[in-house]
């Protein structure tokens, strides 16, 4: 029997650059996540984790940064020995401009992890850049988040990293509000505004398409049943063709007025259907809910 193949994403970088958002995104994609793990505990952590699920593929994401101790220089060395555990390890380094980091700290009023050294914020940022420079140099990818908001960063992580460490076709089902614009990166866009709107039901207005009451409402609507059936037939046919054409990933977007009920429901239902059909690399992204 072929041994299970495991994937490890190491998220590092500068404080305030979006590492926590990235780690949470991987968690939402069913990665087993741990933040602020001391570097010296990494081998033990992985051995324990792999022992728990010995016969299944494991997808693990860990956050390691300046808070993780003084042994950051050992991280890249350990990454290259990960194949001993049949692990594909990927090191991602997140950063942002000094101006962006200063603004983010001003907005959140959080303390920098190195502030206990008696440094000003610009000095702490400069020192952190110096201490993490070896990790940046060794990283598989360096992500500058200066121009990203939270939604853009989450989507970038999903499309560029979380779904691309596989030779299989990766599927992203996205919901959005037309009033905020159509996602320019979508391969297929479906307009759900023609469907009955749960927003006009007072007891459903505050809920989303993820909630069971909204699902029950949608599944009682004949037009919704027909809409889903026809889109399912279309995608079942053409996604298989796209995989045969060696596409890496496909984004399918559903839009409605507010991006809260109909589009979310449809994206969730299509993602569930895709998993049931055997697609292993499937994710959802709800732009207006993030």
UniProtKB/Swiss-Prot annotation:
The protein's name: Nucleotide-binding protein XF_1405
Positions with a binding annotation for GTP: 65-68
Pfam families linked: PapZ_C (PF22740), RapZ-like_N (PF03668)
Record-stated family: Belongs to the RapZ-like family.
Disulfide feature: none
Positions contributing to ATP binding: 13-20
Molecular function terms from GO: ATP binding; GTP binding
Alphabetically ordered keywords of this record: ATP-binding, GTP-binding, Nucleotide-binding
Lineage, highest ranks first: Bacteria, Pseudomonadati, Pseudomonadota, Gammaproteobacteria, Lysobacterales
């Amino acid at each position: 029997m072929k041994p299970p193949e495991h994937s490890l994403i190491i998220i590092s970088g500068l404080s305030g650059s979006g590492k926590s958002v990235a780690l949470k995104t991987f968690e939402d994609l069913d990665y087993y996540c741990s933040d602020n793990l001391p570097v010296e505990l990494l081998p033990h952590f992985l051995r324990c984790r792999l022992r728990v699920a010995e016969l299944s593929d494991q997808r693990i994401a860990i956050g390691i940064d300046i808070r993780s101790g003084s042994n950051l220089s050992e991280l890249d060395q350990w990454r290259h020995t990960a194949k001993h555990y049949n692990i594909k390890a990927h090191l991602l380094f997140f950063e942002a401009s000094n101006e962006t980091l200063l603004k983010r700290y001003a907005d959140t009023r959080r303390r920098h992890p190195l502030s206990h050294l008696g440094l000003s914020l610009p000095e702490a940022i400069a020192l952190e850049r110096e201490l993490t420079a070896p990790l940046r140099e060794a990283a598989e990818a360096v992500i500058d988040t200066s121009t990203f908001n939270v939604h853009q960063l989450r989507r970038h992580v999903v499309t560029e990293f979380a779904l691309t460490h596989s030779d299989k076709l990766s599927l992203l089902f996205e919901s959005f509000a037309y009033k905020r614009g159509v996602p320019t990166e979508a391969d297929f866009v479906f307009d759900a505004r023609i469907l009955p709107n749960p927003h006009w039901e007072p007891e459903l207005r505050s809920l989303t398409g993820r909630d069971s009451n909204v699902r029950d409402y949608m599944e009682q609507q004949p037009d919704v049943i027909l809409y889903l059936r026809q889109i399912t037939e279309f995608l079942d046919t053409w996604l298989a063709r796209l995989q045969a054409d060696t596409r890496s990933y496909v984004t399918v977007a559903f839009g409605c007025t507010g991006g809260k009920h109909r589009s979310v429901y449809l994206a969730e239902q299509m993602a569930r259907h895709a998993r049931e059909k055997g697609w292993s690399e499937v994710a959802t992204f709800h732009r207006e809910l993030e």
